[in-house]
Structure formats: structure tokens, C-alpha cells
Regions:
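C-terminal "post-core" interaction segments
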Residues: 30-45, 49-63, 237-442
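Flexible, low-complexity junctional segments that flank or bridge functional domains
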Residues: 2-278, 284-286, 302, 306, ...
């Protein structure tokens, strides 16, 4: 018996080792094991657009961005579009000569845009914009009046260049996941001096914009102004009761903080008071932490389905996220096991600027039939790439971001849809909140 004890201990010990190794292997190949907090991205300096780069500096930056792209983005584990290889060859050709930082920015932007991922792009450096407001609808660029309302005047030329030529250049150089994103790009980048110069507009003099109402042309003289082209938006988080019986929740950004927790406390109060109609407003919400959206649904005694997808490990992801692995990938399965609260009527307000995690909230509600979407569709596809990592090119100092995850919506039968269409569509210029209130009170 005594002779058998060491043998038994050995067998048990070996079995435990096999078990531990098996558990570790399972976790290693099926879960994102995080072993550190990851390093915070540090800006190594600002790009100087007019600065000249040597041939060697250009080549080094181009080699770097191609390496980052192909070793980080999940699309390279799937079917890569032919447009990517065309753009890559064009970029490699550009590495044979010196260019300015601005010229390199344009070429790299075209390269990154070839996969049409709205999360993967350069942080576009531009500080001069036409002092004009317009809206791209149904294939036309309409002038807006001082109150941001549509006019009947359509932009047909900027300088001597036909508007169609400029739009084609924007389509080629900036990522768009759907027609909404394309319209946003046109509205934004058509104002930029660098973009206009690239297509041949003479920006050394006052810019003449040709307008047409279908009967006659009119010339409008427009100046460039410096500063951001972005309008200010309300990114607050708060709640209130409107019309005595509707709980309005403004989620201006997807962030878990004290104000969100106060809103959740208010929701409990609203429920105890018998309020049945709830509006969550994510208009112009750029995204953030999707858990903030989950917390709001949970407070309403609801639960969305689960996004599936893929996480790709890479040196960049390991550095910034603290993953154990720096290569390979793991996959997750979607499910649409949503939980609806039939005692509550839920309405999600969205527009073209509802993005990333905020768009996920709308998809959860739509796929799980938890409520109604009111407004206009997002520039973000319901299934998309995301969870961005930052990068900076050594010589040009250009900064950008790249997705390292793919997200597949809960209802996989709708995976290929490019747009999440609202249940109640609200035309541009009409108030989305007012439309939702009218629908509730009808």
C-alpha cells in the first residue's frame, strides 16, 4: 500500500496539471485575458500640414500604417474587398517621393477609407472652412438659411469645379458605411480648404459658389473661416417629466458617471409614480461605453440581446488594452434573447449623428422589439467594426484610430443591412422630440 501512495499522488498531480493546462488553454483561446491596464496613448506632437517630408520619411510612415492596418483590423481575417488592394498599391506608389504632410494625409485617408469602416480613419487635420451651411439630400447639396432650414437653392459649382467632381473625391477619400455617412462626409469635407485645393479649386481668392433653383443660377461669394466645423451639441445626461406623463431621458454621451446614476434613480421614481411612456434621446450621441445603455434598459426592467462578433489580438491591441495575447482572435455568437417590459412604452430618438454605442442601444431596442425608433437613421451600420485603438505616424505626426473588434447585431438575419430604419421617420428640419410626443399623445 505504501508503495502505491507515491504512484497515486503522481497520477493525481499529473491529472491536476492536465486539468489546469486544459482550463488555461480554453480561456486562452476563447476569452480576452487582460493582464494589465494597457498604456495610455500619448501624442508625440502635432502635424504641420505644410511641412515637407523626405522620401525616406514618407516611406517609413507608409510602411508603418500598412503594418498597423493589416495586423490590427478584423477585416483581414475575412474577405478583404478588392478596393483595399487598389488603395494599398496607390499608397505604396506614393512612397517613392517626398510630399507635404497635408498631401500624405490625403493619400493615407484614401487608403484607410478603402474598407469603409467609419471607426477607422485619420483624425483629419483641417482648420480653414467655407463659411456656409448646407445639407445633402437625395443627391443634391441644398443651401440652408440662417435658421438652418432648407432652401430651394442647390449648389452646382464651387469655383470652376463641378460639384459632382468634388463629391466623387470625397467618396474616395473618406469612409462611409452607408448613404447617411456619405451625406455627412459631403456636408463636412466640402467646406474644407485642403479638400477643395486637392480637386483644383483656386483657394487663393474669394470662393464663388454657384447656386441654382432650377430656373436661374446665382453666384454667392463665400469666405474661409478658421476653427472647427463642428456645431456644438448637448452631451448632457439628465431626465425630466414632460407633458405630465412622459419620462424624458437625455443620454448625450454613453458614459457611466454620477449623473447617469441619478437618472437611474429617477427612473425608479417615475415607475413608482405609474409613468408608462419613456423617451431615451440619443440624438447626436457619439457613443462611448455601451454599458451605460444597458443600465438604462435594466432600470426599465428590459434587456437587449447580445452582440456577437470578433476580437482580433495584435501588438497594438496588447499595448493599449493589456491583453495577454498579441496575435490570433476570438469569436462571439450573437443572440436575440431580449426581455421586454410590456408595462412600458419605450421610444428611442436617433439621427444621423447617433453613433457607436448609442447606435447599439437603438439596435437592441429594434432587434428585440423593445420599443420604437423615432427620427432618422444613423451613419453607423447596425453590424459594424469598432472599439478603436489609436496610432500616430512617426514623421508626419498624423494621428488616427483603427477598429480591433467586429460587432454583429443580435438579430443575425439582419446582419447585412446597412441602415437601421426608424419606425417613425422624421424629415430633416422637423423636431424629433415633438414628433415622438405627438405620437404618444395621439
Amino acid at each position: 500500500m505504501k508503495k502505491r501512495i507515491p504512484k497515486i499522488i503522481g497520477v493525481v498531480g499529473f491529472s491536476l496539471i492536465i486539468l489546469v493546462v486544459g482550463i488555461f488553454a480554453y480561456l486562452y483561446f476563447n476569452h480576452a485575458i487582460i493582464i494589465s491596464e494597457g498604456k495610455e496613448f500619448k501624442n508625440q506632437g502635432s502635424p504641420i500640414i505644410k511641412s515637407q517630408l523626405s522620401k525616406d520619411e514618407v516611406k517609413e510612415d507608409i510602411d508603418y500604417i500598412i503594418d498597423i492596418m493589416e495586423n490590427t483590423h478584423p477585416i483581414f481575417l475575412e474577405d478583404v474587398p478588392e478596393s483595399y488592394y487598389i488603395a494599398k498599391n496607390e499608397l505604396l506608389t506614393a512612397s517613392n517621393q517626398g510630399v507635404t504632410v497635408g498631401e500624405l494625409q490625403y493619400k493615407v485617408s484614401r487608403y484607410l477609407s478603402s474598407i469603409n469602416d467609419g471607426h477607422t480613419a485619420l483624425w483629419w487635420e483641417e482648420n480653414m472652412f467655407l463659411d456656409i451651411d448646407w445639407k445633402y439630400l437625395d443627391g443634391n447639396l441644398y443651401l440652408l438659411d440662417s435658421n438652418k432650414k432648407l432652401t430651394d437653392k442647390v449648389v452646382t459649382k464651387i469655383g470652376d469645379i463641378e460639384i459632382g467632381k468634388i463629391i466623387e473625391s470625397i467618396r474616395a477619400h473618406f469612409p462611409a458605411e452607408n448613404y447617411v455617412a456619405e451625406a455627412k462626409n459631403i456636408e463636412r469635407f466640402l467646406k474644407g480648404k485642403l479638400v477643395l485645393e486637392n480637386v483644383g479649386v483656386d483657394c487663393a481668392k474669394d470662393i464663388l459658389v454657384t447656386l441654382s433653383n432650377g430656373e436661374e443660377d446665382k453666384i454667392l461669394e463665400v469666405e474661409f473661416i478658421s476653427g472647427s466645423e463642428y456645431r456644438s451639441v448637448n452631451n448632457g445626461i439628465y431626465s425630466k417629466v414632460i407633458d405630465k406623463n412622459i419620462a424624458y431621458i437625455r443620454l448625450g454621451t454613453c458614459e457611466i458617471n454620477s449623473t447617469l446614476k441619478s437618472v437611474i434613480e429617477n427612473i425608479e421614481k417615475y415607475k413608482s409614480e405609474g409613468i408608462k411612456d419613456y423617451i431615451i434621446d440619443v440624438i447626436d450621441n457619439p457613443g462611448g461605453d455601451s454599458n451605460a445603455c444597458s443600465m438604462l434598459l435594466e432600470a426599465l426592467n428590459m434587456k437587449g440581446g447580445a452582440y456577437g462578433g470578433m476580437l482580433r489580438f495584435s501588438p497594438l491591441a496588447q499595448d493599449q488594452r493589456g491583453y495577454l495575447r498579441k496575435s490570433g482572435h476570438i469569436e462571439y455568437k450573437s443572440n436575440n434573447n431580449a426581455v421586454k417590459n410590456n408595462d412600458i412604452n419605450l421610444y428611442i430618438l436617433t439621427n444621423e449623428n447617433t453613433f457607436s454605442s448609442a447606435q447599439m442601444l437603438a439596435v437592441w431596442v429594434s432587434d428585440g422589439n423593445l420599443g420604437k425608433i423615432v427620427g432618422r437613421p444613423s451613419s453607423n451600420m447596425p453590424s459594424n467594426y469598432g472599439d478603436v485603438l489609436k496610432f500616430q505616424m512617426k514623421n508626419s505626426k498624423l494621428i488616427g484610430q483603427i477598429s480591433h473588434k467586429k460587432f454583429i447585431r443580435p438579430d443575425i438575419g439582419k446582419d447585412k443591412e446597412q441602415i437601421l430604419e426608424p419606425d417613425i421617420y422624421v424629415e430633416y428640419g422637423d423636431d424629433i422630440l415633438e414628433r415622438a410626443i405627438d405620437y404618444i399623445n395621439k
